[in-house]
From Swiss-Prot:
One of its GO terms (cellular component) is core mediator complex. The keyword 4Fe-4S does not apply. Residues 1346-1367 have a biased composition (Polar residues). Disulfide bonds: none annotated. Residues 1343-1367 are annotated as: Disordered. The keyword Nucleus applies. GO terms for biological process: positive regulation of gene expression; positive regulation of T cell extravasation; positive regulation of transcription elongation by RNA polymerase II; positive regulation of transcription initiation by RNA polymerase II; regulation of DNA-templated transcription; RNA polymerase II preinitiation complex assembly. The lineage of its organism: Eukaryota, Metazoa, Chordata, Craniata, Vertebrata. Its main location: nucleus. This is Mediator of RNA polymerase II transcription subunit 23. It comes from Mus musculus (Mouse). It is found in: Nucleus. Belongs to the Mediator complex subunit 23 family.
Length: 1367
């Protein structure tokens, strides 16, 4: 091949001897040149046609090599003309020629003439190259230009500029050689943010990149760097807050020239999240950190160090380190964060200590030094045994810096808890010294002179063998010697002995013959807080080991109340999670269960129900799964344990947070049975109600009409297989539409009330006719017998006023688990009986018998009976009768009311501050003993039956606390039925005080007002009553201003029915300002300080958000008006809203409005329609400037030239950034139904792109269907605008954005719809968008790996595999 080629081309360039002798004197005529060209091409065409396809590239490369081997510019020029003609006549493919020319090793900038001629040829033929080829050529030319040094002779610059001209042609928008989006991607790869382009390209490249700033702006959320989340403890996080773990930057899609602040590390965001208590899961989610992979994260380390420095600065200004003060809470939280992140090796301890030293050097911050050493001691004492001494020595460097004293530091007052912090440095020295002595290290660290008095005090205290609990000496010794087993035994032994009891003394517990070890006073929280994590771990390990030992030995003596309460308190510490709650759920519970230690099992479940706080949702769902397993075991079929298991399960189900339900239940999609009850209809109904509430509050089903393809389907189907049931129409109407549709399709035939009555009469006749006792007992207690026995007992009491001994024996034989079905039938039977009652005397008789069954005979507990009644599905009049029975049971006799009022009056919900809970608990049970084994009936029968069943230990529970989760359900049922509103008000008046003991009163109120927003419209009095009852129940246990604002308390609580209070704008401003100040960490904050470990909410912002939403939903103002008033806080000029941090206010509005029901936030759509229809966007003459300046909120705001459109844009972004994907899923419908008909101008179109563009990434990740619909809507709008306009001024930014959308998000998923639209556009637009359609059947221009590198995505015929296809 080479020989043939050589002969063809040498023939055409050969010269005569005379020409060589007189170079430059001879010249071919144009005709001769042309003849040569034609003959050369003819010979080459013949050769080329005989060449195989595979050899084409090799052939072209040889030709280029041949040309570049020539030294005469004239020859090179002539041969290039040959190549040009070959390309122009279609003989050679232009892409192959261009690539061979540019990639030739001989093409060097020093050969200036060759360089100039080559790029002139490329410029001439590049128009024929396909867009993918042009993209590759652009990349190759840019890389070639990089070989030109920074300084060259000015003589050669002119020739080098030929390359620039090719680049200019490629980048020429009107030439449309390739999508400009590809060009900017290649340029930004070579010249990322902050890197200047090569001097040869001058401003050509930077000007071109600048034309993409509008596209970048369209894809950016206004003020994104100022938006902050509210941290919740469920760890639920959407993709909005993800950061790059190496740089802390936002993960931006595409290599666009985004605004500078978006490329900055988002330290403020991470720092804010780190500062929040219970934020560690969110931090891990934001940075993509996985506990299983030990990966050090230096940026996280830096922020932790900065937080410590900030705490040191705060301590410097605080007068005293008071109990529960801001500074103490901050140090407590810091300690917890540090241990977690260092323990999982996300941060390095020695690196952090050295960094701290560097940042504190020369600052003179020493007031907080003891607290800092206390934080460091936590980690050192727990990990020094497993790590090298060298890792901990940098602490001594820090000591030298922070403890400059030459004289001895005096011993602090050890009666105060702060003394443990003052001793922290001495404790650190003791641990370091112990490690040095034990290791091979010859290093001895002498005790610093300033710590000598502290050290001597500890030594002396250790010699005192009788340690008292009245000061902090024991804690000090535990902290100092926790790594020295000889010395540690004494103080730890003293702690343990205090709570275990001495083994001889006994104290009674509620119920018959139930005794416990005699220690009743738990270790106070102050003391537990004063122990290091290492000491706490030893203590909790000791307790868990003792519990397991007692479980194995099946001890008849119950655990000491002090031990149980202390164990509960230790479980609140997140730092000891592995031995704490994780060990409790994964090891202790299963071990106790296997040992059949039912008393201890009952105790552990009681602890979980009444003493646990902020337990992560996966542990709670794991426990729920355990409970369903437990419920099926024969040994748990006894009244007290069965009741406890069901009550605990009910609490777990109803307490699931709305954002927790989906992430937790999707973990069980393969086996939904594990989290559902096989036999308890009430628990499964409670789960469905929780599911309905969660999907409503999170707007999961918004825009959907079916549960097909969702995570709910299998769960609901399994429930209907286990416990088929129906829902009353008034309950069903509150469900989200897809759930309503499911239950209408899966309707279960109901037994008629008449049949029930007939069956009861039939069985009662049988009962009266039978005489043989054994036969009766067998007949009525056998499995498979209709569950009508309670109905028969009712009949006996109605007719004979007593129950025989056989009745008692049947009840006992039936067993706890089977009896639930009897209660269910009895609930239906009662409704029938009361419905058909003649009233008057007969009704009173019915009421008396029912109350006797509960309180006199103890046949069924009040909470179980009411739960069954509340969960039945009666309609109309029967539903009212059912609720009437509930009201009678709760209020008619004094039994329950007295129990409630005495319990509320004598007890406090702040159990962590109490030392005498056990005493109060026992006196309450003595006054109102729990009777769970039909004691009343056993005493009444003739002859009386002695009770055999011993009681399991009860440490915390009683009928009032057991009733609370049932009361939650009762209130909801009453809300659903309009005619029983007055009855609900009466219940709240008499029993509302119980909410003092609810573990999540504000969340319950928030969920209720949110879920029943439609039911409660125009029922302002009931709304007010509900809020007053629940919030008012806590008035004695919460400081003033903890929840509702003073303005609300003053006006709304006292408003008259005929004259409801309508707040002014200033009210809404103050309410938003309260959340803004809370999130900014203002000190003192708008809300009183509290110990967040025992609070309903994990941190101040979560508390502020929920109480604000409750107050707004409680107003006697329609949701639409409240929503508009919230938007007006920033959209109208408000004197109370400071200009300088307007985005913080928008952030707060976004958080609040998205946490409210749909009528509150949907008003934003109306505002957007108003702005889009306004003259500033519809009239071409109204705003003569640049639209991107008009939409740039930050620039407009800073220059005081803001307009309503930029404010509305920024506010919409803040709202949508905080929205759930369910709320966002209304955007496609909003675009097509509300905006598409009105968008006629370019400004309007660009405004819509600005609005929705930044959220395409969320749609791609979470709901692809919506992304596809939005993509099509964008093209429909473009068609509208194109048809309504004579000329488009901003065609390029529009097209750039559409290319970005295609290559980053939609791929080919919208190809078919879009092709039809593009065909109908005007030629100029159609030319620019031709690469999007497949009309020309052009290939994609990007390799598949580009998706991850920020380059355009590949095209395919389906939705890209990376897109999650969701509902």
């Amino acid at each position: 091949m080479e020989t043939q080629l050589q002969s063809i081309f040498e023939e055409v360039v050969k010269t005569e001897i005379i020409e060589e002798a007189f170079p430059g004197m001879f010249m071919d005529t144009p005709e001769d040149e042309k003849t040569k060209l034609i003959s050369c091409l003819a010979a080459f065409r013949q050769f080329w046609s005989g060449l195989s396809q595979e050899s084409h590239e090799q052939c072209v490369q040889w030709i280029v090599k041949f040309i570049h081997g020539q030294h005469s510019p004239k020859r090179i020029s002539f041969l290039y003309d040959c190549l040009a003609m070959a390309v122009e006549t279609g003989l050679l493919p232009p892409r192959m020629v261009c690539e061979s020319l540019i990639n030739s090793d001989s093409l060097e900038w020093e050969r200036t003439q060759l360089w100039a001629l080559t790029f002139k040829l490329v410029r001439k033929i590049i128009g024929g190259v396909d867009y993918k080829g042009v993209r590759d050529l652009l990349k190759a030319i840019l890389e070639k230009i990089l070989t030109i040094p920074n300084t060259v002779s000015s003589a050669v610059v002119q020739q080098l500029l030929a390359a620039r001209e090719v680049i200019a042609y490629i980048l020429e928008r009107n030439a449309c050689l390739l999508p400009a989006y590809f060009a900017v991607t290649e340029i930004r790869k070579l010249y990322p943010e902050g890197k200047l382009p090569h001097w040869l390209l001058g401003n050509l490249v930077s000007d071109f990149v600048d034309t993409f700033r509008p596209t970048a702006r369209i894809n950016s959320i206004c003020g994104r760097c100022s938006l902050l989340p509210v941290v919740n403890n469920s760890g639920a996080i959407c993709n909005s807050w993800k950061l790059d773990p190496a740089t802390l930057r936002f993960p931006l899609k595409g290599l666009l020239p985004y605004d500078k602040d978006l490329f900055e590390p988002q330290t403020a965001l991470l720092r804010y999240v780190l500062e929040q208590p219970y934020s560690r899961d969110m931090v891990c989610n934001m940075l993509g950190l996985n506990k299983q992979h030990k990966q050090r994260c230096p940026v996280l380390e830096d922020q932790l160090v900065d937080l410590v420095v900030y705490a040191m600065e705060r301590s410097e200004t605080e007068e005293k380190f008071d109990d529960g003060g801001t500074s103490q809470l901050l140090w407590q939280h810091l300690s917890s964060q540090l241990i977690f992140f260092v323990l999982f090796q996300f941060a390095s301890f020695p690196h952090m200590v050295l960094s701290l030293h560097q940042k504190l050097a020369g600052r003179g911050l020493i007031k907080g030094r003891d607290h800092l050493m206390w934080v460091l001691l936590q980690f050192i004492s727990g990990s020094i045994q497993k790590n090298a001494l060298a890792d901990f020595l940098p602490v001594m460097k820090l000591f030298d810096l922070l403890y400059p004293e030459k004289e001895c530091i005096p011993v602090p007052d050890i009666n105060k808890p702060q003394s443990t912090h003052a001793f922290a440095m001495t404790c650190i020295w003791i641990h370091l010294n112990r490690k040095a002595q034990n290791g091979d290290s010859t290093l001895q660290i002498p005790i610093p002179h300033s710590l000598k008095l502290h050290h001597e005090f500890l030594q002396q205290s250790l010699r005192n063998k009788s340690l008292q609990m009245n000061d902090y000496k024991i804690a000090l010794l535990c902290n100092a010697y926790s790594t020295n087993s000889e010395c540690f035994t004494l103080p730890m032994g003293a702690l343990v002995e205090t709570i275990y009891g001495n083994g001889i003394m006994r104290v009674p517990l509620p119920g018959t013959s139930c005794l416990a070890s005699a220690s009743v006073t738990p270790l106070p929280m102050n003391l537990l807080d004063s122990l290091t994590v290492h000491a706490k771990m030893s203590l909790i390990h000791s307790i868990a080991t003792r519990v397991i030992k007692l479980a194995h030995t099946k001890s008849s003596v119950a655990l000491a109340p002090a031990l149980v309460e202390t164990y509960s308190r230790l479980l609140v510490y997140m730092e000891i999670e592995s031995l704490g709650i994780k060990g409790f759920i994964s090891q202790l519970l299963p071990t106790v269960f296997k040992s059949h230690a039912w008393g201890i099992l009952h105790t552990l479940l009681e602890m979980f129900s009444h003493r646990m706080h902020h337990i992560q949702p996966h542990y709670r769902v794991q426990l729920l799964s355990h409970l369903h397993t437990l419920a099926a075991v024969a040994q748990t079929n006894q009244n007290q344990l069965h009741l406890c298991v069901e009550s605990t399960a009910l609490r777990l189900i109803t307490a699931l947070g709305s954002s927790e339900v989906q992430p937790q239940f999707t973990r069980f999609l393969n086996d939904p049975k594990t989290v559902l009850s096989a036999e308890s209809e009430e628990l499964n109904r409670a789960l469905i109600l929780t599911l309905a509430r969660a999907t409503h509050v999170t707007d999961f089903f918004t825009g959907s009409d079916s549960i097909q393809g969702t995570w709910c389907k299998d769960i609901l189907q399994t429930i209907m297989n286990f416990t088929p049931h129906n829902w009353a129409s008034h309950t069903l109407s509150c469900f989200p539409a897809p759930l309503q549709a499911f239950f209408k399709q899966n309707n279960v035939p109901q037994e008629s009330r008449f049949n029930l009555k007939k069956n009861v009469e039939e069985e009662y006749r049988k009962w009266k006719s039978m005489t043989d006792e054994n036969e009766i007992i067998t007949q009525f207690s056998v499995q498979g017998f209709p569950p009508l026995f309670l109905c028969l007992l009712w009949k006996m009491l109605l007719e004979t006023d007593h129950i025989s001994q056989i009745g008692y024996k049947v009840l006992e034989r039936i067993g706890a688990r089977a009896l639930v079905a009897h209660v269910r039938t009895f609930a239906d039977f009662l409704v029938y009986e009361f419905s058909t009652s003649a009233g008057g005397q007969q009704l009173n008789k019915c009421i008396e018998i029912l109350n006797d069954m509960v309180w006199k005979y103890n046949i069924v507990t009040l909470d179980r009976l009411i739960l069954c009644l509340a969960m039945r599905s009666h309609e109309g009049n029967e539903a009212q009768v059912c609720y009437f029975i509930i009201q009678l049971l709760l209020l008619k006799p004094n039994d329950f009311r007295n129990r409630v009022s005495d319990f509320v009056k004598e007890n406090s919900p702040e159990h962590w501050l109490q030392s005498d809970w056990h005493t109060k608990h026992m006196s309450y049970h003595k006054k109102y003993p729990e009777k769970l084994y039909f004691e009343g009936l056993a005493e009444q029968v003739d002859p009386p039956v002695p009770i055999q069943s011993p009681y399991l230990p009860i440490y915390f529970g009683n009928v009032c606390l057991r009733f609370l989760p049932v009361f939650d359900i009762v209130i909801h049922r009453f809300l659903e039925l309009l005619p029983v509103s007055k009855s609900l008000e009466t219940l709240l008046d008499h029993l509302g005080g119980l909410y003092k003991f609810h573990d999540r009163p504000v969340t319950y109120l928030y969920n209720t007002l949110h879920y029943y927003e439609m039911c409660l419209r125009n029922r302002d009095h009931l709304k007010r009553k509900l809020v007053h009852a629940i919030i008012g129940s806590l008035k004695d246990n919460r400081p003033q201003g903890w929840c509702l604002s003073d303005t609300y308390l003053k006006h709304a609580m006292n408003a008259r029915e005929d004259n409801p209070w309508v707040p002014e704008d200033s009210y809404y401003c103050k309410l938003i300002g309260r959340l803004v100040d809370t999130m900014a960490g203002k000190s003192p904050g708008p809300f009183p300080n509290c110990d967040w470990r025992f609070n309903e909410f994990p941190n101040p912002a979560a508390h502020a958000l929920h109480v604000t939403c409750v107050e707004l939903m409680a107003l006697a103002v329609p949701g639409k008006d409240v929503g508009n008033a919230l938007l007006n806080v920033v959209l109208k000029s408000q004197p109370l809203v400071p200009r300088e941090n307007i985005t913080a206010w928008m952030n707060a509005i976004g958080l609040i409005i998205t946490a409210l029901p749909e009528p509150y936030w949907i008003v934003l759509h109306d505002r957007i329609v108003n702005v889009i229809s306004s003259s500033s966007l519809t009239s071409e003459t109204e705003w003569v400037g640049y639209p991107f300046r008009l939409f740039d909120f930050t620039a407009c705001h800073q220059s005081y030239s803001e307009m309503s459109c930029s404010y509305t844009l920024a506010l919409a972004h803040a709202v949508w950034h905080h929205s759930s994907i369910g709320q966002l899923s209304l955007i496609p419908k909003f675009l097509t139904e509300a905006l598409l008909p009105v968008v006629k101008t370019e400004f309007q179109l660009l405004y819509v792109y600005h609005l929705v563009g930044p959220f395409l990434q969320r749609f791609q990740q979470e709901r692809t269907r919506c992304m596809i619909e939005i993509g099509v809507a964008f093209y429909d709008m473009l068609l509208n605008v194109d048809q309504c306009s004579t000329h488009l001024n901003y065609m390029d930014p529009i097209c750039d954005f559409l290319y970005h959308m295609k290559y980053m998000f939609t791929g080919d998923s919208v190809k078919e719809q879009v092709e039809k639209i593009i065909c109908n556009l005007k030629p100029a637009l159609k030319l620019r968008l031709r690469f999007i359609t497949h009309i020309s059947k052009m290939e994609p221009a990007v390799p598949p790996q580009a998706l991850n590198s920020g380059s355009p995505a590949p095209q395919s015929n389906q939705v890209p595999a990376s897109l999650p296809v969701t509902q």
